[in-house]
Amino acid sequence: MPSVMEKSHGSSAVISRNRAKSDSLGNSEEESSEDEAPRDSMIRVGSDYQAQIPECKPDNTSPSGNVELKGMLVWSPSQFVSDAKLNEYITMAKEKHGYNVEQSLGMLLWHKHDVERSLADLANFTPFPEEWSVEDKVLFEQAFSFHGKSFQRIQQMLPEKLIPSLVKYYYSWKKTRSRTSVMDRQARRLQAKREEGMEEVEDQIKMSDNETDVTETKKEAPVPQKVVSGAVSGKTGPVRKEPLISQYRHHPLRSRQRPPKGIHLNKSDVSAVCASSEMPAIALCQLETQLISLKRQVQNIKQMNSSLKESLEGGISEMRPPELNIKLNARWTTDEQLLAVQAVRKYGKDFQAISEVLGNKTPSQVKTFFISYRRRFNLEEVLQEWEAEQEPSPPPASTDMSNKTSGSSQTPNEEDDEVQITSVSSSSQPAPPAAAAAASLSLPPPLLRPAIPCAPTLHRQPPPLQPGRLLQPRPPPLVRPAPRQSPRAPPALVGSHAESTFS
């Protein structure tokens, strides 16, 4: 028991000590707060409580973070530099050195509007590249679509850009937004016109529906009976109708009913329709018949197009001409020889064209034919005729004179070489007229020999491979003209025709 009492007495002593310490601490805090309270509330007056202000130094610029925001003069126009010279300087600085307009003008202002010095100094500096990259521009557009003109929020998406640069780029970007191509403008106009036309049609449909509803209600409503009594209306005599309040009171132009898009009213047509009560029905019948005929034409054209498309689906292999397997042959048949002579008469020495006409001969084979058969088919004269056709034809008077001179200049050697069959006086032969001479000198059709002039029946015509001359008419072959100096007795083959010439 005494031990327990001692323990309890010791514990109570400890508790009392702790309580005493806490009371002493609380009292000290209260005293300190009471001491501080009068100190805070006192008025501080005197030199001890005043701030020491340094002297003003206007020349020294205080370092601050807003130095970049200060403006700097970039360009000031001067009367010593003309506009043409200034434009030339700007283009040269842009093309050669890559300066923009602002940088080039700043350089010119730095050199006090001396163009030559500024041009010489442009190569010593490298201009800043474009500050706004493609990514920056895209980010700016997105930020502007989100935040509008709140440039502080836009700067949060573009932290490396200053607000003045954002504002500057905004105004330059705003100008480019209004630039649209001509095609876009035209598309917008057409879209607006279509929308207006659709709105007009819808308004007319609504108006027509309203009119039909009004007519139906009028038909359904019973006809009121006339009641003659003073209690119905307080006024006697004609009653003035109250004007209906228009739906488009503020817009009187909209109250006008316009025809649908594409329909225009013509005064003559309206007067013709209003002439009689049957004219509208007749006009509608005519328009319906025209519409039916046009629909038939459209249907026929569609059927034709569908049939043509079906025929094209199979391809065009059936329409192609069959390929001829022509084999080259070195042998010349009679028909090929005659065709080659006519081709020489048509194309001259164009062996490629002649080979294409023949089909189974090469140009080299045609050339060898021309060389080997030159004398047999008289190809030199045929070639001369072709050359004469290529040259411009002389006038008819000169051709007549050449015919006379050629007829008189025949040599006796040519007369001796020919074989005499009959003698015919030159006076008995009638002179050909000018029209016949012109017809004989006309150009022949392609691949055909020229027409032979009319001659007596006893005279033989030359073979088809030896065409007659065009420029110098000569007597037919194997016929010799009779000599004029010593006329001889006619042979028995001529008969009475020769006797009449010498009588």
Swiss-Prot record:
Keywords on record: Coiled coil, Nucleus, Repeat, Repressor, Transcription, Transcription regulation
Start and end residues of each ELM2 domain: 41-126
Ranges of Low complexity composition bias in the record: 423-442
Role summary: May act as a component of a corepressor complex that represses transcription.
Domain SANT residues, every copy: 127-178, 327-378
Subcellular location: Nucleus
Keyword Coiled coil on entry: yes
Molecular function GO labels: DNA-binding transcription factor binding; transcription corepressor activity
Protein name stated in the entry: REST corepressor 2
Originating organism: Xenopus laevis (African clawed frog)
A Pfam family this chain is assigned to: ELM2
Disulfide bonds: none
Residues making up the signal peptide according to the UniProt record: none
Family designation: Belongs to the CoREST family.
GO biological process: negative regulation of DNA-templated transcription; regulation of transcription by RNA polymerase II
Region of interest (Disordered), residue spans: 1-62, 385-503
Gene3D superfamilies: 1.20.58.1880, 4.10.1240.50, Homeodomain-like
Gene Ontology cellular-component annotations: histone deacetylase complex; nucleus; transcription regulator complex
